[in-house]
Structure formats: C-alpha cells, structure tokens
Curated annotation (Swiss-Prot):
Cofactor annotation remark: Binds 1 zinc ion per subunit.
Keywords: Aminoacyl-tRNA synthetase, ATP-binding, Cytoplasm, Ligase, Metal-binding, Nucleotide-binding, Protein biosynthesis, RNA-binding, tRNA-binding, Zinc
Function noted in UniProt: Catalyzes the attachment of alanine to tRNA(Ala) in a two-step reaction: alanine is first activated by ATP to form Ala-AMP and then transferred to the acceptor end of tRNA(Ala). Also edits incorrectly charged Ser-tRNA(Ala) and Gly-tRNA(Ala) via its editing domain.
Gene3D superfamilies assigned: 2.40.30.130, 3.10.310.40, 3.30.54.20, 6.10.250.550, Bira Bifunctional Protein, Domain 2 (3.30.930.10), Threonyl-trna Synthetase, Chain A, domain 2 (3.30.980.10)
Species of the source: Chlamydia muridarum (strain MoPn / Nigg)
Binding residue positions for Zn(2+): H561, H565, C663, H667
Pfam families per UniProt: DHHA1 (PF02272), tRNA-synt_2c (PF01411), tRNA_SAD (PF07973)
EC number: 6.1.1.7
An example Gene Ontology biological process: alanyl-tRNA aminoacylation
Record note on domains: Consists of three domains; the N-terminal catalytic domain, the editing domain and the C-terminal C-Ala domain. The editing domain removes incorrectly charged amino acids, while the C-Ala domain, along with tRNA(Ala), serves as a bridge to cooperatively bring together the editing and aminoacylation centers thus stimulating deacylation of misacylated tRNAs.
Name of protein: Alanine--tRNA ligase
Length: 875
C-alpha cells in the first residue's frame, strides 16, 4: 500500500532530523471537551502550544488519526458526493515547540515534497499571507515568483481561538493539469480541484489579545499538516481519493458483497464511497473506545453508521453487512495500527448489533412514513415536524423522505425541518461543552508558585509547610475551628485523586490545630488540594505542620488497586484480547471496572475470572514498580496503557505477576497482601460496555461469611441439610413449574371462554372490524393474552383496544392485524395519537403497542375515537 510507504518515509525523514516520533492520539480527545473529535495533528500538542505543558523534546512528527464529522469541522454530508471529503483521514505533520521556525519549516517541506512525495517541482505552487514577506522571500529560493501567491486572513491566517496563539500560514499546492479545470493559477481555481492543496504550514508567532492586538510570542512554534489520502491520490493520479489505495480496496470489497461494479460517475458510486469511508471511521472510533449512542460523540457515530446503512440499501443491502468489510480494512491498515487487529471482533459485534437495531427501526420508520403520507393527504405536504421525526428518530435521510413524497405528489416543509435540525445541532453543541466545576474554579487564582511535591510513594507521614488555604469562595490565609476548606502543602504524602483511584484521607496537624482531610484532589496542574474541616484550633499559611495519611485506608486502597489490575488482565485472558478498559474506580471498599464486551458474562465466566485472580493472589509475587521512558514502552504489547491518561516522558510501569500496566497509583507490596478477591456484581453500563464490581481482603471475606449465613437460614426455612439444598430447591422449583402450568391452563380456558363472548361485541367500519374493551384489574394482568387470543379468532382487518387499571394508572394496549400493518397502519402511532391529549406515553411495534396514562375518557368515548380514526385512515 502506497499509504504505508508514504507514512513510514515521512516519519523517517523527520526522525532523521531530530524530531521525536509521537504516536497518534485517539480519534477523540479524552481531556478536551471543546472539540468532539481529533481533527488535526496539533490537537494532542495544544497545551504545549499554550505553554501549559512541558515536554523533553522540542521537535515532533506524527501521523494523526482524525475524524471530521461533528462540531465546527463537519464533512459528513459531503462525503460520497465530492472528490476528497472524508470523515476519517490521516494527517502527517511536523512540529516545532520554540525550536526552528519558518526557514527550516519551509526548507523541510520542499525537501519532503521532492524526495518523499516525489513531486515534479514544476507543478508545485505556494501561498503565503499578504503581510508575510519573510515566508515569500524563503519560497523564492525554491519557486519562481509567479508561482507564489499572497492571500488574506481568510485563507492564510490561523488561530486556535478568538484570543491566544496564532499566526500566518503557508499552503503548498500541486497542479493536476487541465483535466481538472482551465484555471491558470490558484487564484482562478475557486473549487481547488486543479490546484490541489496538499500541505499547510502554520507559523505561530503572535498572541492575539482580547482587543485584537497581535503581540509577538516569545516562543515561536511550527505546526504543519498534510493529508495522507490526498497525497496518495496525487501520486496515484486518480480523480478522487476513493480510487486509490485503502479506500479503493474497501470499495472492491463492497463490489464483491453487492455484486455490483463500482463506477465513480454513476449515481450508485456515492454509495460505495460513503460505505468505504464510514466503515473506516467507525472501526477506528470503536477501537479507540467510542460506541454509538444517543448523545455527543456516540450520537455522531450512530449517524455515521445509519448513513452507511441507508446508502447500502441503494446497493441492495437489506441486512447487516458492514462487519464483513472490516477484515479488508485490517488487511490494509492493521500493520500500521495493530490495535485494529486486536479490536476486530469487538468492531464487528458493535457494527452488527447497531445495524440489526437500525433495520428494525427502519421498518417502523417506513411504516410511519406511509402513515404520515396518509394523514397529510388533505394538504399534500409532509410537515417539518414529521420529517424531522422520521430523520432524527428513525434515521430516514431527508432526501429519501423528499423522494418518497415526490412519488406521491407531496412536498416537504423544509423551512420548519431545517429550523428543527438547527435547534437539535445547537443542543448537541451545548452538550459537548462541559461546565467548569465551580468548586475548583477558585483554585485557578492560587499563586502559581504554590506547587506541591508528592512524596507519598515512599512515606505516609512527613513534616511540611502550609503554602496556601482556600475556602472555596476565596483565597485565605487562615482557617478557624469548624471551617471547611482546602489546604495546599509544600510537600505531601497524600495521593490526589486521579487515574480512577480515590484521593487519600487523614490529618494535617501541629500544636495550633488539627485539620481532618476527607479527600485529596488536583484542581490544576502542579497543585494538590487537601479538602476537609478544621476540627480544633486554627491554622495559617507558612505554618510548619505534619501531614499524616490514614494508613489503614491507604493500604485497602492500594490492595484494591492492585486487585483491579489483576482483574483487568484476567478479563483479557478469559474473554479475549478485544477487552479494553473503558473506566475504573478504586477506593478502600470496592473496585469498579468498565470494559468493552458485547454480552453479559455467564456465571461460569465470572467464576473463571474470580478464580484466576485468586490464583494470582495466592502466588504472592512481589508487585514491582519501575520508571521508564514513555518512548521505550509506548509500543509494548505487554504493557497496558489507557488513552484517558496523559503520560509524561517518564512513566511508572506496575507489574503484578501476569499484569503489566502504566499507572501512577499506589499498590500492594505483593499480590498476597490482597488476601481474597470477590466479584459482587456484573452488569451493562451502555451498549458494548460492561461493568464488574468487586472487593478484596476483609470486605470480600465478610461477603462470603454473609452468604454462608444466608445459606444456613435458607436450609432451616426449607428444612434441608446444607449439602442437600440444591436437590431440595430443584424439587421445589419443579413443583412450582407444574403448578404454574396448571394455573396457565385454567387461565387459558377462562380467556378462551371470555373471548368467544367478545366476538359478538365487535363493531365494523369500512370493512375493518374493531373492539374496545375494558378489563378488570385482575383480568388486566393477562391483557396481552386476551389480545393475542382474540386476534387468532379474527386474523384479518381487525384492530383491538384494551383498557385496564394498575397502580392508579390506566393501562392501554392496541393490537393491529398483520394485513393492516402491511397497509401502513402502526399500532404505536395510533396509541401515541390516542394518549397524547391525556399526557400518556407508550412503546411497542407496528403490530402491538402498550402505554399508560393517569387520565382517559370513558370506554364509549374511546370506541367513538377509534371508529373515527378507522374511518379516516382506512377510507
């Protein structure tokens, strides 16, 4: 694959020129809620550019995985319809943090263009900012003046935000020839098809103030980005990015599955392009820990998947098919991104599960669309509200809704639709911006020289000094008895909450007073805050104090943290390499571990995992902790690391028997210190994410003892020895099953008899029979049984509506015969319409739906409403 060669040679070029190769960050920034997805190579270096973070290197090079499908940078709707828009792409880049600037950046870019990209220099053009005389002069060393163009802020000025670091930029373009347009220069090429931009060099040299003033930065930086797919297309001389390399390989797989030949210019060509791009985006997102959902990034992923499925229908796919394309992606990109291979099973399972769910939704949406068409007959227009619901809830693309409407000589209220869509986008945008924790905001005003040194790995007590006091609404110098606040120490043995481990508790004291520490946090970089309450006396800044961690709780936390590591490894060994940690929490009482897995764990699997962890505990191997250069361990398949954590140049490698992880937390001295491990709960957190809760040591033993006590009590109640409990319980359950069968038979007979009498009560309108019937509360327990039995007796052209009461609410069930469903009648839509005036809610399918409401009209009124509804809809 040309992309693999280009990527490798680009990184080698800069590595040979003293750039540190930095691995791609995930496709979404864990610690930056200001953007939905990673959309540029500079995202992971943002805090370095802002001066908030230091690194040991001043030069870096990356190939960054990017997604542009939400927020400010959103190419989703363009994908498939243009020659170069993608939701997923790779951005090659080189970066300088106060090292070299324009001269070397331009020199490097020219050399790479010729020696790595192998471009003909006679076809290269450059643009610079109209005020950037320095860049213009530098390009004159390589290009004739008539191939260097000065442009305005709109095209050649870059800024991270309204204020802060910014600067001029310079773009490199390649002339693809007259085949792509008659323009003779980039200035005439409005669409950018002939003179294709392939690299952008950003020179961060200013700091923009709130009044717009540009001040010179003390540390000037360089940030460049070149789209890999665009480079591959240029070198392959293809019309679009889809006709070359990885994307063409994926399109070939779609050709094979659909048995349709791809033609870029035919109408179905867009479907091939959409599917190829979207499968790649989804696969990388799932690999990095994202899952389709209903909010924020998950919502965007679900939109991408549903868009791929809808375009798949144009190629004849009416079943889940996306997972079948994944092996072709791994075949082409698995070597560069081995994490794709490890996550293959999970990617396929997530895609298939989502597709199955969506196909069911589409069936309901299609039925609903036909119903909407019927209900809008008098206006010959689909309302914007209905169109938005069909798109947002049921995933029907607006162009498909419009086409179906046109087939029936209907129009769509697009103005209202677009208004509702904009409102939904605004809600989504607001949801992505996390509000700063009010209780932490005051810490931003703490003197930046008041930093804390953590010494708690080696000691649980130390003599130190109070550097600062915070009372949550103000910076203070004293704390009096009974007051709550936070104390900042010069050195501290207290571990601050991070990496899923709870912060330490304990005491800070001297002769003047005692402060009880309830928890410890890091409200901003370099600052450790000890939160709590002054129990007696008074304390003030500069005082000499003793900081004492609660030793018993620290030991329990450390044991649980090591237990969490063992659990994580046991999950991987027992369930497969697709297991990825999705979150964790450890305190003195429990372990909570979230992990990627698509189904509930069986009792046998849980027992296997628990047994394996306890085996490792009994081995009593030392827990070793060593420091290492992150660059030395970042690509190790043996050492677990998590994208949610920000790693520095030096990292801690924690090894506990078969488990090896990068971790900054506190741990047991040996696995035997944990004592005993017990799983207490396993359940789903969200689609594709499971959670195990567990505990260790005395807490685990207490659970075991409590369960043993319960068994003794059960044995006494059912009058059986403990060793015969299982046999006795099975006998009891068999007896219960027999009794249940007898009861069911009696109930069935009762229902059959009552249904026969109801047949004479059915009414008829427009050749459709219907029944509205009120069941007693006792009969209402079998409401579904009544409906199913009656519809067996009247299998066609029949609608039944049943009402009963439960817990001071009306329970309503609507059942529709299959032939009416095929005509577009939807039980849920009918029930929604019926309950809406009374504030009721419902759920279900086209054939049957059930809901409830606090209010409901008399049964006679319901009969009239249903009769009128049938008269209108089935005229």
């Amino acid at each position: 694959m040309l992309s693999n060669t280009l990527r490798s040679n680009f990184l080698k070029f800069y590595t040979n020129r003293n750039h540190t190769p930095v691995a791609s960050s995930p496709v979404f920034p864990y610690n930056d809620p200001s953007i939905l997805f990673t959309n540029a190579g500079m995202n992971q270096f943002k805090n370095i550019f802002l001066g908030k973070e230091q690194t040991s290197y001043t030069r870096a090079t990356t190939s960054q995985k990017c997604i542009r499908a939400g927020g400010k940078h959103n190419d989703l709707e363009n994908v498939g319809h243009t020659s170069r828009h993608l939701t997923f792409f790779e951005m090659l880049g080189n970066f300088s943090f106060g090292d070299y600037f324009k001269q070397d950046a331009i020199s490097f870019a020219w050399e790479v263009s010729l020696s790595v990209f192998n471009f003909d220099p006679d076809f290269i053009y450059a643009t610079v900012h109209e005020k950037d005389d320095e860049a213009f002069a530098l390009w004159e060393k390589y290009l004739p003046t008539n191939r260097i163009f000065r442009l305005t802020d709109k095209d050649n000025f870059w800024s991270m935000a309204d204020t802060g670091p910014c600067g001029f930029c310079s773009e490199l373009l390649f002339d693809r020839g007259e085949k792509f347009g008659k323009a003779t220069s980039p200035l005439e090429d409005a669409d950018g098809e002939r003179f294709l931009e392939y690299w952008n060099l950003v020179f961060m040299e200013f700091n923009r103030t709130s009044d717009g003033t540009l001040l010179a930065l003390q540390k000037k930086c360089v940030d460049t980005g070149a789209g890999l797919e665009r480079l591959v297309s240029l070198l392959s001389e293809t019309d679009t990015v889809f006709e070359a390399d990885v994307l063409r390989h994926l399109i070939a797989k779609v050709e094979n599955l659909s048995e349709i030949t791809y033609s870029p210019t035919e109408s179905k060509g867009s479907a091939f392009r959409v599917i190829a791009d979207h499968v790649r985006s989804l696969s990388f997102a799932i690999t990095d820990g994202l899952l389709p959902g209903n909010t924020e990034r998950g919502y965007v992923l679900r939109k991408i998947l549903r868009r791929a499925v809808n375009y798949g229908k144009r190629l004849g796919f009416h079943r889940p098919f996306l997972a079948e394309i994944v092996p072709s992606l791994i075949e082409t990109m698995g070597e560069a991104y081995p994490e794709l291979q490890a996550a293959e099973t999970q990617i396929q399972e997530v895609l298939t599960t989502e597709e199955e769910h969506f196909f069911k939704t589409l069936q309901r949406g299609g039925n609903l669309l036909h119903q909407v068409l019927k209900s809008s007959a008098s206006l010959s227009k689909i309302s914007g509200e209905d169109a938005f619901k069909l798109k947002d809830t049921y995933g029907l693309p607006i162009d498909e809704i419009a086409l179906l409407a046109k087939d029936h000589n209907y129009t769509v209220d697009m103005d209202t639709f677009r208004k509702l869509e904009m409102e939904a986008k605004e809600r989504s945008r607001k949801n992505t911006v996390k509000n700063k924790n009010d209780s932490d905001s005051i810490f931003q005003d703490v003197d930046p020289t008041n930093t804390s040194e953590f010494v708690g790995y080696d000691m649980l007590s130390c003599d130190t000094f109070i550097e600062g006091i915070v009372k949550y609404n103000e910076i203070a110098s004293t704390l009096e008895e009974g007051e709550e606040g936070a104390i900042i120490l010069r050195t501290t043995p207290f571990y601050a909450e991070k990496g899923g481990q709870v912060g330490d508790s304990g005491e800070i004291f001297c002769e003047s007073g005692t402060f009880l520490v309830s928890h410890t946090t890091t409200p901003k970089a370099g600052l450790i805050a000890h939160h709590g309450k002054l129990s007696q006396g008074s304390l003030q800044t500069t005082m000499a104090v003793t900081a004492q961690v609660n030793q018993n709780l620290r030991k329990k936390i450390a044991n649980n943290h090591t237990g969490c590591h063992l659990l994580h490894k046991a999950l991987e060994v027992s369930l497969g390499e697709h297991i990825r940690q999705a979150g964790s929490y450890v305190d003195s009482q429990k372990i909570r571990l979230d992990f990627s897995h698509n189904k509930a764990l069986s009792p046998e699997e849980l027992l296997t995992i628990e047994t394996l962890v306890n085996e490792k505990i009994r081995e009593n191997v030392p827990v070793t902790i060593r420091e290492a250069l992150y660059s030395d361990v970042m690509n190790s398949s043996e050492i677990k690391q998590f994208f949610g954590d920000k790693y520095g140049d030096i990292v801690r490698v924690v090894s506990a028997g078969f488990s090896h992880e990068l971790c900054g937390g506190t741990h047991a001295r040996a696995t035997g210190d944990i004592g005993y491990f017990r799983i207490t709960k396993e359940h789903a957190v969200s689609t594709g994410i499971r959670r195990i809760e567990a505990t260790t040591g005395e807490d685990a033993e207490n659970i075991a003892r409590g369960q043993d006590t319960d068994l003794n009590e059960i044995a006494t109640i059912i009058q059986s020895p403990k060793d015969q409990l299982l046999v006795k319980l099975r006998n009891v359950m068999e007896e219960k099953k027999d009794l249940a069968k007898q009861l069911a038979n009696l109930e069935n007979q009762l229902v059959q008899q009552q249904v026969k009498s109801l047949l004479t009560s059915c009414d008829k309108v427009n050749e459709t029979s219907y029944l509205v019937y009120h069941l007693t509360e006792e009969e209402g327990q079998r409401i579904q049984h009544y409906a199913n039995t009656l519809h067996k007796e009247v299998p066609a052209k029949f609608i039944s509506l049943w009402v009963t009461e439960k817990n001071d609410r009306y329970i309503v069930l609507v059942r529709v015969s299959d032939d009416l469903v095929k005509q577009g009648i939807d039980a849920q839509a009918l029930l929604e319409e019926l309950l809406a005036p009374y504030g009721g809610r419902c759920g279900g399918k086209a054939v049957s739906a059930q809901g409830s409401s606090k209010e409901l009209p008399q049964i006679e009124v319901l009969n009239t409403i249903l009769r009128q509804w049938i008269s209108t809809r089935l005229a």
